Regions:
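Generic recognition of stable, solvent-exposed alpha-helical segments in well-folded globular domains
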Residues: 1, 5-8, 12, 54, ...
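Glycine-rich, acidic loop regions that bind phosphate or pyrophosphate groups
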Residues: 1-32
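Residue-level signal for well-ordered alpha-helical positions
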Residues: 13-16, 88, 147, 166-167
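Active-site diphosphate/adenylate-binding microenvironment
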Residues: 34-117
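Thiamine diphosphate
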Residues: 83-161
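Short, hinge-like loop/turn segments at secondary-structure boundaries
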Residues: 91-94, 169-173
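Active-site-proximal loop->helix
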Residues: 142, 163-171
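Single conserved hydrophobic/aromatic residue that forms the stacking wall/gate
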Residues: 175-178, 182-183
Length: 183
C-alpha cells in the first residue's frame, strides 16, 4: 500500500508517469464510442413533430438550446422524461443537472428544484417532469409561490406512468399495467 499525504503522493505519481513518457491510450476507445453513437443513436432524425404529436427528444433539445449553460440548473423528476433530459440536455458545469438517478424516487424533482433555486437564486431553475411524477409533490407549488421561488416546470403528459408501462410491457403484465394517471 501507498501511505502518505494525498497531495504529495499524487504529485509523485504524476511526476513518475510523466518521466516514463506514459500517454493515455484513449484514441481506440474514443473511436469505438463514436462508432457506437453512429450505429445506435439516442435520437432518430426521422422522428418528426407534427400537429398533435410532440417528440420528447426534440422538446429536450429545444429546452437545452434555450437555457443559459452557465447560469441554469435542470432538475428532473423520475420517469421516461428523466432519461430524455439526461440524454438531450447539455450541461457545461458540474452540479447543474440534478436527478435522483436510478433510485425511482417519484416526487423528488420539484422540491429539489425549489431547493436549487434557494441555493442558487441568480440561476434559472427548470424542473423537467412527467404527469405521473409531478403529481407526487405538486402541492409544493404553494411552497414556491409563498416563498417567491421562480422555478419553471416543464411537464410531459402522456397520461400514464410511462416508465411503468415501458417495463411491464416486455413481460406482458397486462393485468397489472399502470393506467391513466391524470385526466
Amino acid at each position: 500500500p501507498i501511505v502518505g499525504d494525498l497531495r504529495g503522493v499524487l504529485a509523485g505519481i504524476n511526476e513518475a508517469v510523466a518521466k516514463a513518457g506514459a500517454k493515455p491510450i484513449t484514441a481506440p476507445w474514443l473511436a469505438q464510442i463514436a462508432e457506437w453513437r453512429r450505429r445506435f443513436p439516442f435520437y432518430h432524425s426521422d422522428l418528426v413533430e407534427d400537429p398533435g404529436r410532440i417528440v420528447p427528444e426534440t422538446v429536450m433539445q429545444k429546452l437545452s438550446r434555450k437555457l443559459d449553460p452557465k447560469h441554469s440548473i435542470v432538475v428532473t423528476e423520475v420517469g421516461q422524461h428523466q432519461m430524455w433530459a439526461a440524454q438531450f440536455i447539455d450541461r457545461e458545469k458540474p452540479r447543474t443537472f440534478i436527478s435522483s438517478g436510478g433510485l425511482g424516487t417519484m416526487g423528488f424533482g420539484f422540491p429539489a428544484a425549489i431547493g436549487a433555486a434557494f441555493g442558487r437564486p441568480d440561476d434559472q431553475v427548470v424542473c423537467v417532469a412527467g404527469d405521473g411524477s409531478f403529481q407526487m409533490n405538486s402541492q409544493e407549488m404553494a411552497t414556491a409561490a409563498i416563498n417567491g421561488v421562480p422555478v419553471k416546470v416543464l411537464i410531459l403528459d402522456n397520461r400514464a406512468l410511462g416508465m411503468v408501462h415501458q417495463w411491464q410491457k416486455p413481460v406482458s403484465y397486462t393485468h397489472l399495467r399502470a393506467h391513466e394517471t391524470c385526466a
